[in-house]
Amino acid sequence: MPSLPTLQPLDLYRRTLACLVLAVSCLGGGGLWADDARTSIEQRSNAVSQVLLGIFSYVRWPKEPAVLQLCVVGPTEYADGLLRGMVQANGRRVHAERRAVDNPDLGTLCNVIYLGVVDERERQQVFRSLAGHPVLSISERGTECSVGSMFCLNVGGPRITFEANLDSIARSGVRVHPSVLKLARRQATP
């Protein structure tokens, strides 16, 4: 059996140092990846805000609010840009704040609901509180557009798109210009 080569203290020191440099560079790279992920989420949040401003421009309420009250309900991934506040092209401010899923006054407090991740029971509860009130409903997840929400975002790919639920739009109490359906076919780049 051949004997293993013995490492001199200087060789051992160099190899240990090389391993440490490699480990530190890997850890530093992980931080860069985290920064890239944060930047990507921030870009998508900003793109979501722009898509929503576009949708708002096609919607009319029976009594136009001076300030649009946007309620963010449930855990969300891309609502940070919304919560900072926005201004529509016509100069109307959009005030956004988080509201509890079980708040029975959502229909009177909100002109717009931005719905995050909620279970089916919570979703039904939200839409019961909106019944009879002119509230625009937008879901952050495109998979939930068949039940309740008027518009559902698809944020997963390189572009943000949305779907429109015509049945929910017809029953909502708000008027949505038909051109928004053309907007639904266009894509917004984050």
Curated annotation (Swiss-Prot):
Taxonomic superkingdom: Bacteria
This protein's record includes keyword Transmembrane helix: no
Entry annotated with the keyword Glycoprotein: no
Phenotype upon gene inactivation: Deletion of the gene results in the generation of a small colony variant (SCV) morphology in PAO1. Mutant exhibits slow growth, reduced motility, a highly aggregative and wrinkled colony morphology, strong attachment to surfaces and strong, exopolysaccharide-dependent resistance to macrophage phagocytosis. The deletion mutant, although suffering from a tremendous growth disadvantage, shows characteristic persistence behavior under antibiotic selection and during prolonged infection in vivo.
Activity regulation text: TpbB/YfiN repression is released through an YfiB-dependent sequestration of YfiR to the outer membrane. Binds vitamin B6 (VB6) or L-Trp at the periphery of the dimer, and both VB6 and L-Trp are able to reduce biofilm formation induced by YfiB L43P mutant. However, VB6 or L-Trp alone may have little effects in interrupting the YfiB-YfiR interaction. GMP enhances the binding affinity between YfiB and YfiR.
Keywords: Disulfide bond, Periplasm
Subcellular location(s) of the protein: Periplasm
Entry coiled-coil feature ranges: none
GO annotations of cellular component type: periplasmic space
PTM remark: Cys-71 and Cys-110 form a disulfide bond in the oxidized form but maintain their free form in the non-oxidized YfiR structure. The Cys-145-Cys-152 disulfide bond is well formed in both structures. The Cys145-Cys152 disulfide bond, but not Cys-71-Cys-110, plays an important role in maintaining the correct folding of the protein.
Disulfide bonds: C71-C110, C145-C152
Residues bound to GMP: R60, R175, H177
Protein purpose: Negatively regulates the activity of the diguanylate cyclase TpbB/YfiN, leading to decreased c-di-GMP production. Inhibits TpbB/YfiN allosterically, through a hydrophobic interaction between the C-terminus of YfiR and a conserved region of the periplasmic PAS domain of TpbB/YfiN. Under reducing conditions, may also act as an YfiB-independent sensing device that is able to activate TpbB/YfiN in response to the redox status of the periplasm.
Subunit (UniProt): Homodimer. Interacts with TpbB/YfiN. Interacts with YfiB. The YfiB-YfiR complex is a 2:2 heterotetramer.
Protein name per Swiss-Prot or TrEMBL: Negative regulator YfiR
Encoding gene per record: yfiR
